[in-house]
């Protein structure tokens, strides 16, 4: 798969999707703010820089993820994410 650029939420979330070791992956930047994403496949989000707070659909509490930490989202689900105190960079692996 050739790298593919994606833009969401009026340009506030930018990503580049590619295949790594046979697995679909994307890297990107989330501008400060709050956003909701739906999932088809299960995903693992790793915070590369900055901080993301996340809340998976069906849960009550926001969990803080600083750089170097990850969280997983089930397939056919969704999650809220917010970049706090500036933009955040991430790597998303589709499981």
Language-model regions: role of each:
Residues 11, 20-40, 72-75:
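Conserved short histidine dyad/triad with adjacent acidic residue
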Residues 37, 54, 90-92:
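Short hydrophobic/aromatic-rich beta-strand segments that constitute the beta-sheet cores
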Residues 1-20:
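Transition segment at domain starts
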Residues 74-95:
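Ligand-binding loop in jelly-roll beta-barrel domains
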Residues 40-54:
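Short, conserved beta-strand element in jelly-roll/cupin
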Residues 27-29, 35-39, 56, 62-64, ...:
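Short histidine-centered beta-strand/loop micro-motifs
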Residues 59-76:
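Short acidic-glycine-tyrosine-enriched beta hairpin
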